Amino acid sequence: MEGVNGTIVILCLVGVALAIFLSYKFNLQMGISAMVFAFIIGVLFMGLRVKNVIAMFPTSVFFQVMALSLFFGVGVVNGTMEIVAKKMLYATRKRPYMLVFMLMLIGFALGILGCVPPAAGAILAVMGFTIAVPSGVDPLICASLGYSCNAGSFVKWGASGAIINAKIAEQGYEAESSAYTWEIFAISTIVSILLIVICFFIWKGYKVKEVVGMEEPKPFTREQKSTLILILVVVFFAVVPGILKTFIGGPFLKKLTEFCDIQVLCLIGFIIAHFLKLAKPREVINKCPWNTLILLAGISMLMSVAVQAGAVTIISDWLTATIPGWLLPFFMCLLGAFLSSFSGGITVVFPMVAPIVPALVQSSGGTLNAMVLFLAAVLGAHFTGMSPFSTGGAVFMGMNRDESIAKRLVTGQLVVCLLGVVLGGIILTILGIVL
């Protein structure tokens, strides 16, 4: 079916809403529901064949996230990530004013080291509620710290960065996808730090007490030391050959850079970890975020049906006809923020919103900066990812066991999200004007 069909697009959006409703109300896997709706709408209403809908399965993104999760899952299973976090906390026990920022660094480290945001957020939330809050840190500062592990995961090999990089490449920006992903990671990191600092002063994080009774963490085991070395080696080969190719060039470095794709390196790293007996492979495989992968696949398939029905044309035409060019990044941020408020953040929202970007750039005659528009979608989804109705926010709330604190969290987390969206909107508007 060619052209634009507004009715089909509306049906797809209803399908997304129903998938979210069925997930929250009946605990039905959102990705499976979305796949079913993709088949119903694609085959019965658009005249597609079943194999056409199956072809919309996001194989590249699915494979990337799986490979990353398998490799970095070794460090989660054998306790390497936990020991790294505890050692960083122990270092600040006599400097209580540094506790919040050490937790922030732990969050970034967990994200950069490949820990998936829900798992990293859960680790950070446990530390926040068991160490920071008893020391006088406001729970809402701890909520803002969740943005550190999310932003850390935007690094190219991170759980979210792999999705961002792959989806940007799918939109016709394959040559620029790597640079765009690094820029999005850098800007998101800066904005996240700014928001955490703002929350630190709003809720008086400088008044924290000294952490008492904290035992010195155990030293790294042989397996954990080997895991850290292996992670550093993988990161080295993922980054350095590309840098050398840029500055030196040559066929060997070009071929090496092509081979040193993060997903290939992660699979090689997983095999090496297996032979070094760093963790039980079956346990690592079981820890792989299969639910998130199925969710991502289902939403991507349903939104691909919507794209084929003309969703991108409808939204881009409305935005370009109604919104001034310099304000488009802000509205893309609002769109990402709204969608992420009730779903799984980047993994769900970015694949939905990313296809709009090329159409906006084309309709503007190339005056709009594609990276800024991709960044806008990421920041919007990023900041409302701590909404109490979103996965990240729900995980954070679930780690709290104090009923008196629980009463503040729902409205408080929404305030933190609002602060983030406003801050992100201001920065995006400036970037939209400057770039």
Identify the residue ranges that each predicted region occupies.
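Short helix-coil transition sites and intra-membrane helix breaks within transmembrane domains
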Residues: 26-30, 60-61, 73-82, 111-123, ...
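Hydrophobic transmembrane alpha-helices of multi-pass solute/ion transporters
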Residues: 2-93, 240-323
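Hydrophobic alpha-helical transmembrane segments
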Residues: 9-14, 32-35, 97-105, 119-123, ...
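Hydrophobic alpha-helical transmembrane segments in multi-pass integral membrane proteins
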Residues: 159, 236-240, 299-316, 361, ...
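Hydrophobic alpha-helical transmembrane segments of multi-pass integral membrane proteins
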Residues: 94-135, 140, 146, 322-378
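Small-residue-rich segments of transmembrane alpha-helices in multi-pass membrane proteins
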Residues: 38-45, 97-101, 152-157, 292-306, ...
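Long, contiguous bundles of hydrophobic transmembrane helices that form the permeation core
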Residues: 1-9, 13, 40, 186-284, ...
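Membrane-core helix-loop-helix motifs of multi-pass transport proteins
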Residues: 130-220, 369-376, 393-435
